[in-house]
A protein has these predicted regions:
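Hydrophobic h-region of N-terminal signal peptides that target proteins for export
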Residues: 8-19
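Short, solvent-exposed turn/loop segments enriched in Gly/Ser/Thr/Pro and often Arg
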Residues: 113-120, 168-172, 218-222, 265-268, ...
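A short, flexible beta-alpha/helix-coil linker loop
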Residues: 79-83, 224-226, 328-330
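Short, well-ordered, mixed-charge alpha-helical segments that flank or form enzyme active sites
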Residues: 173-177, 225-227, 270
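Bacterial N-terminal signal peptides that target proteins for export
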Residues: 1-7
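A short small-residue
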Residues: 180-184, 223-228
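N-terminal catalytic cores of secreted or lumenal carbohydrate-active enzymes
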Residues: 35-214, 235, 241, 245
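Substrate-binding and catalytic surfaces of secreted/luminal carbohydrate-active proteins
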Residues: 23-40, 46, 51-61, 165-167, ...
Length: 475
């Protein structure tokens, strides 16, 4: 094997050249109206492929055409998640950790986001310094030692001792801002730019002293949103200048230049403009690992703007793209088992990966039976909810849809060419470091679909129920 070719891609090339013929295909399924949840529902044999007709519905995978690597797939541990987790019985805590982070028997989360001090998904606003302490002499993460840090450490342990972890701030402390509040937007006062930059470095050092390695940071959560919770506005030019004149140099001087800095961290709608302003400035771009984005641009109506992910990927191919937050808002217990919520996840994961994303991070991993706690009442869905009165855990369809990606597509995998012949099916495929090929196929229609599954020159026959998702694995 050419040592320059990743093992996963080399194995995939073998599949593309016809070596799948005679191999076994595992079909794992989650389907509405059935008990199937990440269930191995069938095994199929590959045979030599034949030319499909126009009337056939087919999925085509060409493993010889490889694209971006996978950083990971996971979710966020917020104060809310940690507070709900702490109320669970020990056996239920272990069940949740096992379900999320065990790569063999759970869904193998490999990416984790957390917050720099409070967000709306905290029981109250707080910071790590005393009011007015621009020198950061009072800096302490003692608040997080009660709930969040213990859960983070247990998640890392459950994941086998390593999980790629990054952190995001929702707002600078009130005294550093133009509106003198952590809430309702406002912007960073110029005279506190260096102090705020040093705040990130103090956070990283403090968390690492607690045993939580920080891989990277985003500069600002949702920098164009004035929210009734913790929020702070950065125009594109403001974020560019803060990065190149303050945060980047301060991180480098602190010996943290190897930590990744992620810009934007907001919706797909404005990401091309933000990329142009920051990535086309060489003094800023040198500090930026890439761009984070969210999925909430549909708040104004219209469809998800996946094409903007592709536009940034094509224009700045040296920059990395990462979905940093997604959640279904407007919690309603009657929709807890909604497959529409799950299909929103499936559609976004497939399209974000197909347009160049290297990782995908859901929002809260766990919330209570009201979609909280949230100190401003912004209650949302999570893949798992816990009843704070009974301790009962509810695993939603969204958990299993996320698992169809995270369980079978592992860090270091490379996306490979995949397409469907009809719009009734959506698909993406990855070749894993262990040589396995994982293809996700989703049917969001009201009818089951029989389809031909082609891998290179070989094919197998597969059926997918209505409102279902499958992961097809060739080992």
């Amino acid at each position: 094997m050419n040592p320059a070719i990743p093992a996963a891609v080399a194995c995939a090339i073998g599949l593309a050249q016809g070596q799948a013929a005679g191999a076994t295909l595992e079909v794992h399924t989650t389907a509405s109206g059935t008990p199937s949840r990440l269930a191995l529902t069938s095994t199929e044999q590959f045979v030599a492929g034949r030319q499909p007709s126009e009337g056939d519905i087919s999925v085509f995978v060409n493993p010889a055409k490889a694209f971006q690597p996978l950083l990971g797939i996971g979710g966020a541990i917020t104060d809310a998640s940690a507070e709900v987790f702490a109320k669970l019985a020990p056996k239920d805590q272990e069940r949740l950790l096992h379900a999320y982070y065990d790569a063999k028997d759970g869904i193998g989360y490999s990416l984790l986001r957390t917050t720099i001090h409070s967000s709306d998904f905290s029981s109250a606003s707080y910071t790590y310094v005393a009011e007015g302490d621009a020198k950061l002499d009072s800096f302490s993460v003692a608040h997080d030692r009660e709930f969040r840090i213990p859960l983070l450490k247990r998640a890392i342990a459950a994941a086998g001792g390593h999980i790629t972890t990054y952190a995001s701030p929702w707002s600078a402390p009130a005294f550093m801002k133009t509106n003198a509040s952590m809430l309702q937007g406002g912007s960073l006062k110029p005279e506190f730019a260096d102090a705020w930059a040093r705040y990130y470095t103090r956070f990283i050092r403090a968390y690492e002293q607690e045993g939580i390695p920080i891989w990277g940071i985003t500069i600002q959560n949702e920098p164009m949103a004035k929210q009734r919770w913790e929020s702070m506005i950065f125009s594109a030019e403001d974020e560019r200048d803060f990065l190149k004149n303050h945060l980047g140099p301060v991180m480098a001087k602190a010996g943290l230049g190897d930590r990744k800095i992620i810009v934007w961290d907001h919706n797909r709608d404005l990401m091309t403009q933000r990329a142009h302003v920051i990535f086309d400035d060489p003094d800023a771009s040198r500090y930026a690992w890439g761009m984070g984005f969210h999925w909430y641009e549909t708040w104004a109506g219209g469809a998800p703007m996946f094409a903007n992910v592709d536009a940034v990927h094509r224009a700045w191919p040296d920059k990395h793209l990462l979905l940093t937050e997604a959640t279904v808002e407007g919690f309603d217990p009657a929709r807890m088992q909604s497959f529409a919520n799950a299909e929103r996840y499936g559609t976004a994961l497939i399209n974000d990966f197909n347009n160049g994303a290297e990782g995908w991070t859901d929002w809260n991993i766990l919330l209570d039976e009201k979609g909280g706690p949230n100190h401003v009442g912004n209650f949302c869905f999570a893949p798992v909810h816990a009843d704070s009165n009974t301790g009962e855990l509810t695993f939603t369809p969204s958990f299993y849809y996320l698992g169809h990606f995270s369980k079978f597509i592992r860090p270091g995998a490379h996306r490979v060419d995949a397409s469907a012949s009809r719009s009734s099916l959506q698909t993406t495929a990855f070749s894993n470091p262990d040589g396995s090929l994982a293809t996700v196929v989703m049917n969001a229609t009201d009818k089951p679909v029989d389809y031909r599954f082609f891998v290179g020159k070989s094919e197998a026959r597969v059926s997918i129920p209505a409102h279902a998702i499958q992961t097809l694995v060739v080992r």
